[in-house]
């Protein structure tokens, strides 16, 4: 047994010993009272609200007012006379007043452990150091914690364990709690932003008979009653556009997508997307709307349009750079010439040398995108709208009027990561049918991410869809930016993990 394994074994033995002691204490609680886990305590205040409401009250003013409160929380520290509690908003001390609390209660308090949850009544007071606390007149145990909290000096530092046991991570790490509060704020602000502009929030199917709306490999399942294969959705796009056909001219959805692909710091098989569509608009309108949304989000969450991330600062207050795929390759790779990009064989050689997975049947447009992904994408630090994607890789986007080889599409990159994807929607049913057929050929040639042919969607387009612009924004990656989080797992409450051995 290695030293590391020995240390781990000793730690496990110590934890088992502590758990056994706590179970003995719980057994004593069960014996002493009829209900070991009571549910009749009602608090009337959160700690953060108390701190804010009485911030300007002096020690003398609080003594004179004798403000009664009922609070509840988890024991995070026990300093003898003072116990530090934590609720969902903040931490606050409660004072173990030996002059007013019954002897029986004082004896019970001595048996409580870190992690136990208690309910306390008392009056607000302020210490000589200026700290607000509750001078307890009564207190009782509400929940006995059977497992010890992580060591107070080291906390829960193992990253993988933080992801596996997020409930413990949330207990002991304020930074984690802050991240998920921000996530909630971001989603609430997006809803408000779009609703104020006339967008209708909708819900579309998570189980689909044909996976569509993105180039990705789906999860497949089986519907027993209908005896048919079904797929977890990879995107809601085709259903949202059906709604535009039906007359809902501004719609959005914030929900989960599922893609049966790799796991990394940027990818999780289950992730949250915002998708929105507006009729009588194009992709340039969406660029303007996206800039406005991102500035408002940064200001609302950070109080500034400058967004710190790692050792960089992204400037959301400045106009986002707008550059085509083609021009971005030339700008960031001066060794590549227009002649290289316009020749299939030369482009294929560049893509292969750059590390792209070249199969050999790709057209020029797809090769250019491969080169972009390998040689440009990671260099796009400040916000960039990359536009005019080749039509081969944009089966749902409208062709550009001036150059039909490209589409009216953009992807937004910040910090070298794709954050959003948008385009003027293809509303020509015949063109869409042809592109679906091209995707079917790609799939037959071995591309697992190529799209299926969706006959019902073609049927919908044949009724007529107005000129429309649509966009998808990755909520998880956006929250990563706004919380300075290096991994997508830091912003997903329960990320997917391999089973423990």
From Swiss-Prot:
The keyword Cell membrane does not apply. InterPro entries: Aa-tRNA-synt_II (IPR004364), aa-tRNA-synth_II (IPR006195), aa-tRNA-synth_II/BPL/LPL (IPR045864), Lys-tRNA-ligase_II (IPR002313), Lys-tRNA-ligase_II_N (IPR044136), Lys-tRNA-synth_II_C (IPR018149), NA-bd_OB-fold (IPR012340), NA-bd_OB_tRNA (IPR004365). It is found in: Cytoplasm. Keywords: Aminoacyl-tRNA synthetase, ATP-binding, Cytoplasm, Ligase, Magnesium, Metal-binding, Nucleotide-binding, Protein biosynthesis. It catalyses: tRNA(Lys) + L-lysine + ATP = L-lysyl-tRNA(Lys) + AMP + diphosphate. Binds 3 Mg(2+) ions per subunit. Coiled coil: none annotated. Mg(2+) 1 binds at residues 411, 418. GO terms for molecular function: ATP binding; lysine-tRNA ligase activity; magnesium ion binding; tRNA binding. GO terms for biological process: lysyl-tRNA aminoacylation. Its cofactor is Mg(2+). Its EC number is 6.1.1.6. Its main location: cytoplasm. Mg(2+) 2 binds at residue 418. Pfam families: tRNA-synt_2, tRNA_anti-codon. GO terms for cellular component: cytosol. Belongs to the class-II aminoacyl-tRNA synthetase family. Homodimer. HAMAP family: Lys_tRNA_synth_class2 (MF_00252). This is Lysine--tRNA ligase.
């Amino acid at each position: 047994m290695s030293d590391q394994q020995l240390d781990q074994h000793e730690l496990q033995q110590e934890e088992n010993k502590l758990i056994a002691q706590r179970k003995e204490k719980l057994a004593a609680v069960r014996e002493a009272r009829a209900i070991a886990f009571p549910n009749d305590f009602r608090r009337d205040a959160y700690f953060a609200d108390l701190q804010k409401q009485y911030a300007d009250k002096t020690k003398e003013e609080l003594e004179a007012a004798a403000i009664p409160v009922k609070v509840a929380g988890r024991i995070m520290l026990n300093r003898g006379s003072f116990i530090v509690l934590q609720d969902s908003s903040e931490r606050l001390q409660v004072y173990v007043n030996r002059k007013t609390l019954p002897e029986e209660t004082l004896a019970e308090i001595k048996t409580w452990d870190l992690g136990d949850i208690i309910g306390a009544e008392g009056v607000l007071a302020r210490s000589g150091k200026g700290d607000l606390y509750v001078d307890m007149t009564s207190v009782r145990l509400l929940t006995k914690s059977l497992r010890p909290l992580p060591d107070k000096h080291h906390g829960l530092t193992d990253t993988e364990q933080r992801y596996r046991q997020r409930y413990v991570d949330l207990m002991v790490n304020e930074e984690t709690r802050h991240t998920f509060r921000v996530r909630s704020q971001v989603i609430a602000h997006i809803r408000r932003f779009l609703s104020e502009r006339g967008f209708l929030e909708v819900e579309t199917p998570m189980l689909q008979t044909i996976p569509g709306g993105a180039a990705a490999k789906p999860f497949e399942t089986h519907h027993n009653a209908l005896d048919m294969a079904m797929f977890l959705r990879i995107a809601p796009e085709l259903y949202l556009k059906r709604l535009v056909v039906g007359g809902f001219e501004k719609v959005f959805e914030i929900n989960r997508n599922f893609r049966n692909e790799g796991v990394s710091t940027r990818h999780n098989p289950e992730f949250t997307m915002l998708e929105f569509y507006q009729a009588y608009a194009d992709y340039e309108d969406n660029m303007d709307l996206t800039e406005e949304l991102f500035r408002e989000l940064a200001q609302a969450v950070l109080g500034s349009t400058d967004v710190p991330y790692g050792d960089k600062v992204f400037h959301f207050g400045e106009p986002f750079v707008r550059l085509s795929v083609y021009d971005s390759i030339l700008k960031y790779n001066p060794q590549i010439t227009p002649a290289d990009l316009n020749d299939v064989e030369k482009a294929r050689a560049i893509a292969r040398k750059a590390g792209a997975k070249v199969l050999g049947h790709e057209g020029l447009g797809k090769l250019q995108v491969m080169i972009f992904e390998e040689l440009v994408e990671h260099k796009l630090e400040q916000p960039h709208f990359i536009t005019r994607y080749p039509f081969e890789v944009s089966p749902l986007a409208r062709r550009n009027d001036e150059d039909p080889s490209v589409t009216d599409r953009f992807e937004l990159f910040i910090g070298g990561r794709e954050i959003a994807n948008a385009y003027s929607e293809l509303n020509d049913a015949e063109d869409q049918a042809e592109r679906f057929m091209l995707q079917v050929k790609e799939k037959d040639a071995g591309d697992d991410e190529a799209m299926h042919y969706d006959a019902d969607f073609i049927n919908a387009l044949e009724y007529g869809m107005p000129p429309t612009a649509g966009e998808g924004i990755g909520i998880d990656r956006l929250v990563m930016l706004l919380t300075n989080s290096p991994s997508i797992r830091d912003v997903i409450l329960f990320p997917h993990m391999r089973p423990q051995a």
